[in-house]
């Protein structure tokens, strides 16, 4: 069968669908990822065929502009009229899908061009979650930003999804929908690849702590959340790996000797065997840490991050710093908290027992064949 994946051109929306896409390919199906701009190449680097539905798009600049306008408008965490680049992808992708004719479309919650194409060509469509905070209301809100595209392409209404795929751990899932079948799937992190380097080997006599604000938040909000790294990281009894993209370092000052600054690393590799992870609360970071059984400190500010932080804290897998921020004493205590480690390892075991992407791919093919 031909499987079309919608991969919106942002890391947090594209990368989570690539593991399932690879599973379909390994199972012998023809897979195509639809993305845009530089993210078309990012998907191709995963060994997949890609259609660039928005050539030349600078989605990161577009997202920064949207966030700046949202803050000026004082609309809080509401989406506003923002399609997460489905509008920019719509015309090219509708035309392409018309002659490529996929048998199944899979989209993440904000890849709302997927249902439009499904409705136009009467193709089964499935939504794959990428985190905890997805609701039908949320998807409908983003879909409203495609009103003009629905009109341009003579599509009257969104179709009903054949199923939803839930990638969250069973004991933490809060997913609710309008009655579509929910298929559980093990979250298998995809963070890109890299060539092994000697410094990846951790010292056996020292703890390892990862710190990241993800790919979007530093560009939009700066580095205030991790000012403690510059001010007092030397008082933390650990080797600290600080992940900040090269384009988001303008506020960075000198760093203590126990901090290693990196641009891009395969996060799943570094979390295996780490002692803790401090991050902004993005769904990818949250689920990758849960998959590895690593305790977390989650800031949880903006977008879906408060939801991610809350479920981590309620399950006992991490803590939320609150308004007081972080101190070296708090971080040292966190690194030695055995109850956080125990709960995190329990969740990792839950996730390992869930159906893997290959099994889910086979189940979806069966559903399509049965009609």
From Swiss-Prot:
Pathway: Siderophore biosynthesis; enterobactin biosynthesis
Biological processes annotated in GO: enterobactin biosynthetic process
One GO cellular component, as annotated: cytoplasm
EC number, as in UniProt: 2.4.1.369
Outcome (variant: residue 264 to L): Convert 55% of Ent to MGE (45%) and DGE (10%)
EC category name: transferase
Gene3D superfamilies, alphabetized: Glycogen Phosphorylase B
Pfam families reported in the protein's UniProt record: EryCIII-like_C, EryCIII-like_N
Reactions performed catalytically: enterobactin + UDP-alpha-D-glucose = monoglucosyl-enterobactin + UDP; monoglucosyl-enterobactin + UDP-alpha-D-glucose = diglucosyl-enterobactin + UDP + H(+); diglucosyl-enterobactin + UDP-alpha-D-glucose = triglucosyl-enterobactin + UDP + H(+)
Alphabetized GO MF terms: hexosyltransferase activity; UDP-glycosyltransferase activity
Keywords: Cytoplasm, Enterobactin biosynthesis, Glycosyltransferase, Transferase
Main location: cytoplasm
Subcellular location(s) per record: Cytoplasm
Keyword Disulfide bond among UniProt keywords: no
CDD domains (UniProt xref): GT1_Gtf-like
InterPro entries linked: EryCIII-like_C, EryCIII-like_N, Glycosyltransferase_28, UDP_glucos_trans
Effect recorded for residue 304 to N: Loss of activity
SUPFAM superfamilies listed in its UniProt record: UDP-Glycosyltransferase/glycogen phosphorylase
Keyword Amino-acid biosynthesis: no
Function, in words: Catalyzes the successive monoglucosylation, diglucosylation and triglucosylation of enterobactin (Ent). Transfers glucosyl groups from uridine-5'-diphosphoglucose (UDP-Glc) to C5 of one, two or three of the 2,3-dihydroxybenzoyl (DHB) units of Ent to yield monoglucosyl-C-Ent (MGE), diglucosyl-C-Ent (DGE) and triglucosyl-C-Ent (TGE). Glucosylation decreases the membrane affinity of Ent and increases the iron acquisition rate.
Family annotation (PANTHER family): STEROL 3-BETA-GLUCOSYLTRANSFERASE, STEROL 3-BETA-GLUCOSYLTRANSFERASE UGT80A2
Family: Belongs to the glycosyltransferase 28 family.
Name assigned to this protein: Enterobactin C-glucosyltransferase
């Amino acid at each position: 069968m031909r499987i079309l994946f919608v991969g919106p051109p942002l890391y947090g929306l594209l990368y989570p669908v690539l593991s399932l896409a690879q599973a379909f390919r390994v199972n012998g199906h023809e897979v195509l990822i639809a993305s845009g701009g530089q993210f078309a190449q990012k998907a191709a680097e995963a060994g997949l065929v890609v259609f660039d539905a928005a050539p030349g798009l600078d989605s990161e600049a577009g997202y920064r502009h949207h966030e700046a306008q949202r803050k000026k408008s004082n609309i809080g965490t509401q989406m506003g009229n923002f399609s997460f680049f489905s509008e920019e992808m719509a015309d090219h992708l509708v035309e392409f899908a018309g002659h490529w004719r996929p048998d199944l479309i899979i989209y993440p919650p904000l890849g709302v061009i997927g249902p439009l194409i499904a409705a136009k060509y009467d193709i089964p469509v499935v939504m794959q979650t990428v985190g905890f905070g997805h609701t039908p209301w949320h998807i409908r809100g983003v879909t409203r930003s495609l009103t003009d595209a629905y009109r341009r392409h003579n599509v009257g209404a969104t179709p009903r999804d054949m199923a939803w795929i839930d990638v969250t751990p069973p004991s933490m899932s809060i997913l609710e929908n309008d009655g579509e079948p929910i298929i559980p799937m093990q979250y298998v992190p995809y963070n890109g690849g890299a060539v092994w380097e000697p410094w990846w080997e951790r010292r056996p006599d020292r703890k390892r702590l990862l710190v990241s604000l993800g790919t979007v938040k530093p560009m939009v909000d700066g580095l205030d959340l991790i000012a403690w790294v510059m001010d007092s990281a030397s008082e933390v009894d650990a080797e600290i790996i600080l992940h900040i993209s090269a384009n988001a370092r303008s506020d960075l000052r000198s760093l203590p000797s126990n901090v290693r600054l990196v641009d891009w690393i395969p996060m799943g590799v570094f979390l295996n065997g780490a002692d803790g992870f401090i991050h902004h609360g993005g769904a990818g970071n949250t689920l990758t840490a849960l998959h590895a059984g690593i305790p977390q400190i989650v800031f949880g500010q903006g977008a879906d991050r408060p939801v991610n932080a809350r479920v981590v804290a309620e399950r006992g897998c991490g803590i939320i710093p609150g308004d007081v921020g972080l101190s070296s004493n708090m971080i040292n205590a966190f690194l030695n908290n055995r109850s956080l480690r125990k709960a995190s390892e329990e969740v990792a075991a839950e996730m390992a027992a869930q159906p893997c992407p290959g099994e889910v791919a086979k189940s979806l093919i069966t559903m399509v064949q049965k009609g």
